């Protein structure tokens, strides 16, 4: 009987993964935090899964090296070190107050943080999100006491003969006796209807501005403006197909016609005042300008963030255009040319130039500034 027990133990040892047969046996049953923002504005990452080589990569290391250095759609990878608890750890330098994205790489394969449900899609990948406080920007990302309501719904596009998804935010205390300004926010070529609320933090920005008395309560409308509307949760393939259909997006105005129908849907369904605004980032800025021209005198202001716009997008009414661009933005020259055309056309507009590039950290700042200006 004793020999039989020894045989069973030997067989179990043989089938254990090689990693577990070594000294480093990872006890993933104990409680741990995968990401911690420390008091000195450093961030510590922890990964306790199986693996020999683990790295963390994201857009936060660049900001720690140089407070004015920004990157366009690139991330830096840093190796994590296995410590006495059997888990892998890495800590950044002190970094700025911002919303950062990160992901793990385990044995050469990309892996999201399983303990962090705060995620967002960017290009064709899902990223985890960590928010760092500590400066004046913190107020943009703190959670106020009163929160509004997010509705996930759809509207019918007769031009395309299909339903398009849209997220609609109603402010805290939404009342049947009041009417509210409405702001339409359009994502870029690789986004979807959740981009502005997830990566853009549009709701937190608005609610904090309201709490600070810099903005009145507003309805936010964030539609899916992809060439082919997403079915279910975005995937690598669906977002990639949208990017590949970019040429069609630039020449097919069915999406803008669908947005015109969206305004009618919103006006008839919610308590909207006569104050209508629209803004978009990157190619969403082009769609915002086109939609404004399809609805002359409907929008009081148009926000163009890192815009991909041309002379045909010049305004056809008296709406004020707010153009924003970073000096390192890939479309910076385009924004400058469009601003000159606005000057020549004597159209009411403001141009704001910042450091940085084609990044969400800039678009969040642009949105905050735009919201404040349209409420003045």
PLM region descriptions:
Residues 10-18:
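Hydrophobic h-region of N-terminal signal peptides that target proteins for export
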Residues 35-97, 105-135:
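Aromatic-rich carbohydrate-binding modules that target alpha-glucans
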Residues 47-49, 82, 124-175:
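N-terminal cap/lid segment of alpha/beta-hydrolase-fold proteins
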Residues 56, 98-106, 168, 180, ...:
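Short beta-strand segments enriched for Tyr within beta-sheet-rich domains
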Residues 174-180, 185-233:
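Short substrate-entry loop that stabilizes the transition state in hydrolases
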Residues 240-269:
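Alpha/beta-hydrolase active-site loop
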Residues 261, 265-267, 272-317:
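Primarily recognizes the serine-hydrolase "nucleophile elbow" in alpha/beta-hydrolase
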Residues 320-324, 328-376:
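C-terminal catalytic histidine-bearing segment of alpha/beta-hydrolase fold enzymes
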């Amino acid at each position: 009987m004793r020999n039989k027990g020894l045989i069973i133990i030997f067989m179990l040892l043989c089938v254990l993964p090689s990693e577990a047969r070594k000294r480093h046996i990872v006890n993933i049953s104990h409680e741990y935090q995968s990401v911690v923002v420390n008091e000195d504005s450093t961030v510590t990452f922890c990964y306790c899964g199986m693996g020999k080589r683990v790295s963390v990569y994201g857009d936060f290391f660049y900001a720690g090296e140089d407070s004015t250095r920004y990157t366009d759609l690139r991330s830096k990878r840093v190796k994590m070190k296995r410590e006495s608890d059997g888990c892998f750890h890495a800590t950044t330098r002190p970094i700025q107050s911002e919303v950062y994205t990160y992901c793990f790489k385990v044995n050469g394969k990309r892996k999201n943080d399983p303990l962090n449900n705060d995620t967002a899609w960017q290009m064709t990948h899902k990223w985890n999100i960590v928010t760092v406080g500590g400066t004046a920007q913190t107020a943009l990302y703190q959670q106020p006491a009163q929160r509004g309501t997010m509705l996930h719904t759809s509207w019918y596009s007769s031009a395309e003969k299909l339903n398009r998804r849209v997220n609609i935010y109603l402010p805290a205390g939404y009342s049947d006796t009041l009417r509210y300004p409405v702001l339409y926010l359009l994502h870029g070529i690789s986004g979807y209807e959740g981009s502005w609320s997830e990566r853009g933090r549009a709701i937190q920005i608005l609610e904090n501005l309201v709490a600070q008395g810099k903005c009145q309560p507003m309805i936010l409308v964030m539609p899916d403006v992809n060439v082919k509307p997403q079915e279910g949760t975005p995937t690598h393939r669906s977002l990639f197909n949208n990017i590949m259909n970019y040429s069609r997006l630039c020449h097919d105005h069915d999406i803008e016609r669908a947005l015109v129908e969206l305004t009618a849907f919103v006006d008839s369904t919610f308590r909207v005042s006569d104050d209508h605004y629209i803004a978009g980032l990157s190619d969403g800025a082009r769609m915002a300008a086109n939609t404004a021209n399809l609805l002359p005198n409907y929008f009081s202001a148009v926000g163009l963030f890192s815009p991909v716009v041309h002379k045909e997008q010049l305004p056809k009414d008296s709406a004020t255009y707010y153009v924003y661009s970073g000096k390192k933005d890939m479309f910076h020259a385009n924004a400058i040319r469009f601003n000159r055309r606005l000057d020549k056309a004597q159209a009411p507009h403001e141009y704001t130039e910042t450091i940085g590039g084609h990044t969400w950290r800039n678009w969040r700042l642009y949105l905050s500034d735009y919201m404040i200006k349209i409420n003045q």
